[in-house]
Amino acid sequence: MEGKTQAEFEQTDYFQHWQAVISDPKLEKLLTKYGYDAVFYPHFEVQRFLSAFHTEHPRVKIGALGQMDVQTLLMESALLITDFSSIQFDFAYMLKPEIYYQFDEARYWGTHHDRGYFDYRVDGFGEVVTTQEALLQAIETALASECAVTPEMQKHIRDTFGTLDDHNCERNHQAIRELMS
């Protein structure tokens, strides 16, 4: 997104796909049916183009950097929809469900990054979808279950992280002290 004008940004697949999602009447119906609100909070590199995004849906908010605290948003959110963001690890650590919307999966791996050790379909913490229709279906499934994480996914998350508690700082401090002695 670096170096793009807003007009150029509005021509990108990224903008067109996410704009289509946040303005989709089906999303509004799902949110209303299950009693949820959504916050579209794009990556900080996209925040400068935030004025390009719009929605008429009262249950869909567009989150601006500085107006919404990311930590609070993560803590208060019941479901995360992301693409390839590392924020997924924070959300999974809280044992919350995720959906990966990877509409540009082939191009992402072909031009942006090399595939590393992490395979979203194997190692990820939620369903990978590549179409808007599949995304809306995954959202409905999650909302209908009150955003519950399946026992299988809970096991996967626990196996990935080992210890899930609020004592990480203490463990890190102790490990550093042991290394220094």
Show where each model-derived region lies:
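Conserved catalytic-core segment of nucleotide-activated headgroup transferases in glycan assembly
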Residues: 1-52, 129, 164, 168
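Acidic, amphipathic alpha-helical patches
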Residues: 27, 70, 125
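A structural signal for isolated positions on well-ordered beta-strands in alpha/beta enzyme cores
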Residues: 37-39, 61, 99
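Short beta-strand/turn micro-motifs composed of small residues
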Residues: 40-42, 82, 102
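Donor nucleotide-activated moiety binding/catalytic core segment of transferases
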Residues: 44-89
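Catalytic binding pocket for nucleotide-activated donors in carbohydrate/polymer assembly enzymes
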Residues: 52-57, 84-160
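C-terminal alpha-helical cap of glycosyltransferases
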Residues: 165-181
